Regions:
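A short helix-loop-beta-strand connector motif used in the catalytic cores of GNAT acetyltransferases and
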Residues: 50-62, 89
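Conserved acetyl-CoA pyrophosphate-binding loop and the N-cap/start of the following alpha-helix
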Residues: 99, 103-111
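Conserved active-site alpha-helix within GNAT-family acetyltransferase domains
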Residues: 106, 130-149, 153
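Conserved GNAT acetyl-CoA-binding A-motif
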Residues: 117-127
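Conserved beta-strand in the GNAT
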Residues: 62, 68-77
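A conserved beta-turn-beta hairpin within the catalytic core of GNAT-like acetyltransferases
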Residues: 78-90, 100, 146-147
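A short beta-loop-alpha structural element at the N-terminal edge
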Residues: 12-26
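Conserved GNAT-fold acetyl-CoA-binding loop/helix
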Residues: 25-50
């Protein structure tokens, strides 16, 4: 894939609009390919609707360059037994491979950090796969490892 240099001054970060679906979807599919998952279209459609439903604590923000979406971040707020205020969980972060290495991922994380501050969140956290070494370089630069190890158990 060919790299594209972008002028960071031309990058705008903003909440996704409902009309951004067609531009967001290819990046969402690429994100799934990266993680070797195939999320059903019904879940994708439901997720997109949740981003815009007033009672849902799920959000999507996009990075745009010259009107084109080049990255996204999904985040949500949830209660914690460890704090009075909500935690903010950054669930998904993806930047178009053609524009990686230009701090767009960092800007998207900082966008979520700002939203968490506005909501007086007690914590902002996220996970990544142990094989996502490029992502870990960014995360080690902007945050600290918590020392927590994640376990999963099937419920079906």
């Amino acid at each position: 894939s060919q790299k594209t240099d972008v002028n960071l001054a031309e990058i705008t970060l903003q909440p996704a609009a409902e009309t951004d679906f067609a531009a967001w979807l290819p990046l969402w599919k690429s994100y799934q390919t990266f993680y070797r998952v195939d999320i059903p279209d019904t879940v994708t459609q439901l997720t997109w609707k949740r981003f815009f439903h007033s009672v849902e604590p799920m959000y999507c923000a996009v990075a745009k360059c010259e009107g084109r979406i080049v990255g996204f971040v999904h985040y949500l707020f949830h209660r914690s037994t460890w704090a009075e205020s909500d935690y903010c969980y950054l669930e998904d972060l993806f930047v178009d491979p053609a524009v990686r290495g230009q701090h767009i991922g960092k800007q998207l994380i900082e966008y979520v950090q700002l939203q968490a501050r506005k909501r007086h969140s007690a914590s902002l956290y996220w996970h990544t796969h142990e094989t996502n070494l490029r992502g870990q370089r960014l995360y080690n630069w902007v945050a600290e490892k918590s020392g927590m190890i994640e376990y999963r158990m099937r419920v079906k």
